[in-house]
Structures are given as C-alpha cells and as structure tokens.
C-alpha cells in the first residue's frame, strides 16, 4: 500500500517535471527553435490544427524560422494564425513559404523571459509540494486507520520528503540551465 503511494507520488512529480520542460521549450532563447511556434493552431478547413501538421517548420538559422505549407492555399491562414499568436514577429509571406525573422533579443527582453521561466519553475515547485501533501495525507489516513504503524508512517513521510527534495532539485537544475541558455548572447 505504501509502495503504491510512493510510485504514484513519483509518477505525478515526474509529470510536473515534463510539463515544466514543455513550458520551458516554448520560451525564446538566444537561438530560435521551432518550439516557439508549437502552440500555434491554424484554421485547417474549420479545424484548429497545429502548425507543424499543415506544413514543414524549420529553423534555417539562429534568427529565422521557415514554414512551407503542404497546401499553398493555407499561406494566408498560417500568416493570420502567426499574427494572432502574438509571438513578437510579423510573418513574411513570399507566395511559396513564410519566413519569421526574429530580431536579436535585448537584455531587457532576456530578463523578462528569465522572469517567466522563474514563475514557471515556481509553479512546478508548488505542484510538486501539493503532490507531497496529498501523499502525506494518504499516509496519515493509513496510520489513523491502523493499517500501518507509527514507525512505518514516519519512514513513509521521510521517503516522500526525499522524493520531493529530489524533484525540487531537478526543477532548480532545469531552471538554472534554462536561465543560462536565455542569458547566453
């Protein structure tokens, strides 16, 4: 029973880490990646469809993303979706493909993105602590219902705290790496 709680706790904390990694991937760093446009949805015959499913999306260099639609009639829809996404660039439509030119980031922009990353990391820490709280409550209930002894309860709480500390440490490492990536000129 207690081992199931440990596994469930670890699994949920791992999901929080994966969510943080996805959030971090959407942040712009010094080098442009296609992750910046991952959340953009294009109106594809009335259905919101991810941009990477209606065309080829590649980073041609450190400041440019090129989008080649599989159907030429989607160019204006893709252009509109990019403008509505408000990612800080205007699409450049040349009739065959769309280019996004990202200007170099200023130090103020970098600091603002670091703030966003810090908030994302803090949200992940809070989520992990909430998972710990749920697990501890389950352990307390088992102890209260006399399914485990007080000593087993103490050991279980210590193990849950260790799992929590490990995951909080991973959040901190991810944030430090992302911060360094953002601030790198």
UniProtKB/Swiss-Prot annotation:
Q: Which domain of life is it from?
A: Bacteria
Sorted alphabetically, the Gene Ontology BP terms of this entry are:
cytoplasmic translational termination
For this protein, the record's InterPro entries field holds: Ribosome_recyc_fac, Ribosome_recyc_fac_dom, RRF_sf
Instruction: Spell out the subcellular localization from the entry.
Output: Cytoplasm
The UniProt GO MF terms for this protein read:
ribosomal large subunit binding
Keyword annotations:
Cytoplasm, Protein biosynthesis
Coiled-coil stretches, from where to where? none
Q: Name one GO cellular component term.
A: cytosol
Name the HAMAP family for this protein: RRF
**Which NCBIfam families does the protein's record reference?**
frr (TIGR00496)
Functionally, this protein is described as follows:
Responsible for the release of ribosomes from messenger RNA at the termination of protein biosynthesis. May increase the efficiency of translation by recycling ribosomes from one round of translation to another.
* Protein family (similarity comment): Belongs to the RRF family.
* Record-given protein name: Ribosome-recycling factor
**Organism, as annotated:** Sulfurovum sp. (strain NBC37-1)
Lineage per the UniProt record:
Bacteria, Pseudomonadati, Campylobacterota, Epsilonproteobacteria, Campylobacterales
């Amino acid at each position: 029973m207690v081992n199931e709680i440990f596994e469930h706790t670890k699994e949920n904390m791992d999901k929080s880490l994966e969510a943080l990694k996805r959030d971090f991937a959407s942040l712009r760093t010094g080098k442009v990646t296609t992750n910046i446009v991952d959340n953009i949805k294009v109106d594809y015959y009335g259905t919101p469809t991810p941009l990477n499913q209606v065309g080829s999306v590649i980073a041609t260099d450190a400041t440019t993303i090129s989008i080649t639609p599989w159907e030429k009639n989607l160019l204006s829809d893709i252009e509109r979706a990019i403008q509505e996404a408000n990612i800080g660039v205007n699409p450049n439509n040349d009739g065959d493909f769309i280019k996004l030119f990202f200007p170099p980031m200023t130090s103020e922009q970098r600091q603002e993105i670091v703030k966003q990353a810090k908030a994302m990391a803090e949200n992940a820490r809070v989520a992990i602590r909430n998972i710990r709280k749920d697990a501890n409550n389950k352990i307390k209930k088992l102890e209260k219902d006399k399914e485990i002894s007080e000593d087993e309860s103490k050991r279980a709480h210590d193990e849950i705290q260790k799992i929590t500390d490990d995951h909080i440490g991973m959040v901190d490492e991810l944030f430090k790496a992302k911060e360094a990536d953002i601030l790198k000129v």
